[in-house]
Amino acid sequence: GRFTALSGVVGKIITDPSLTGGIAEIGAGLRDVLGDEVGKRLTAPLPDEIQEVLTDARLRLGDVNDTLIAIDTKNEDAKQRKLRAQTMTGRSISQLDIAIEGREGHVAFVSGSRESPRLEIAPLDVGPTMTEGVWSKRTAILTSATIPSSLAERVGMQTSEVEVADVGSPFDYAANSLLYNAIHLPNPNDGGFRAKANDELEALINAAGGRTLALFTSYRAMDEAAEEMKSRLDMPILTQRDLPKPALVQAFTDSEETCLFATAGLFQGVDVPGKTLSLVVIDRIPFPRPDDPLLSARRDLLGPAAFSQIDIPRASMMLAQACGRLIRTSTDKGVVA
């Protein structure tokens, strides 16, 4: 983890084992108290046990930082090691301060897993940081097939200084693709939706002869649909749980009748040209999770405008990226459903 790495870096310039060992202990202490907080925001005042561990960590790193400052060396290699240790220590101290005291414009939250939680500190608005560190110093060229119109404002660019070029697409979507919307299905919140959706999915996959990338907004929906289709269809069904992403995509590519069921991790970065991928099925509009700690804090900041400024743009971008898995070359054809 981060503090194990920091202990190693500091150990190259400080030889006192009580200091370097103390850094390694910070990681273990944080793991013990943050494991149950994964996926949650940390707001002041913190629970006592978390406050105690974070405060102890802050004091230990303060001692390390004081020791680093006191080191006087003329050796260039040692100077570089000292600088790196100070930089990493200072960054960790700053993050702990924000988590302990809170800081306007920042949010503290815990990511990772219960076994390996990570304390994260993120700005609610990246614009000032980007302006100071990038836009005021460099000319930048940003390219993507899915750049939202609001990007310049979101990342702190002066819109008067931004030039936008839309080069269009080399693909003839109208001639090579169809959009199928199963408007006859019941509301997704209705009890009978899943059974009807499975019937629809089975019919679509059969019509395509396999060759399907089915994308879901949750692992639960993916697992349920995959199990149901395995019992109904006489063709290979792979899921995102089966293999690492590169091997999974390769296995899907190698067998034309194979179907791949996946979640948000494969809404982008999947490039399978040709007949192997002829049908992309998307189970729901991929709105971001309401309990995402960073987005939740940004929603609180924006108030009533949050849905239109955060949720809709992100869902639109994810939907566009998912649909973009279908047509990868000028000769590809298929259906998005």
Predicted regions and their residues:
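ASCE RecA-like P-loop NTPase motor cores
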Residues: 1-337
